[in-house]
């Protein structure tokens, strides 16, 4: 293999076309591509080998990041979003009367970013990461209240009935005394109660729906779904998450919550 590589490298009579701009090479002190390829195989010393490795690793990650940015820009142009122009009585009433504690600086910052996204005219696709107990559910609820203030419904999907019930009870308690209809939909809810929930979704009487995979069934339809919150997103398939998009005339805003993000989700 060494003889073969020496033979191949020896055939490089001219420098290879550079794949990075001169400005980028200078800014990051990168080795030219031809030198990097030669020194990765036959380095004159450990320092030269490290520089060659760094150059090739840098280029690979640079183009990965560039493609992610390009995908994000294309996605913003492709998917228009509902414009939530106002923060109204529901949000303000909750903030002034029901907020259980003062928001942390991180929660305030995230809410500000979410409000900006919701009013930008493009579909929000935001990942909300925080440790267990950091207040992600409260941020998600306040985001859903913005949807309600603008005449839209909101839906939260959790991977298990236990977690869905937990969110349901927490949100009902947080909204105590407010005129907001919240319902729970799981596979174990059947009969007249299920029919009443499905009917309320179609009329818009059910403003917030919390549930499991049951919320993506074909029989579940909304009057005006504006925001989807997905908890523990890594436990859902991509196709399962995407099915919620079909529940609205145009794709609803998406807020994904997790304590343990995975690379695939970050790329999305």
What are the roles of these predicted feature ranges?
Residues 125, 139-168, 176-181:
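Conserved SF1/SF2 helicase motif Ia
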Residues 1-98:
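Upstream accessory/linker segments immediately N-terminal to the RecA-like ATPase cores of bacterial MutS
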Residues 212-213, 231-232:
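Walker B catalytic acidic pair
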Residues 188-209, 216-225:
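Conserved motor-coupling elements within RecA-like helicase/translocase cores
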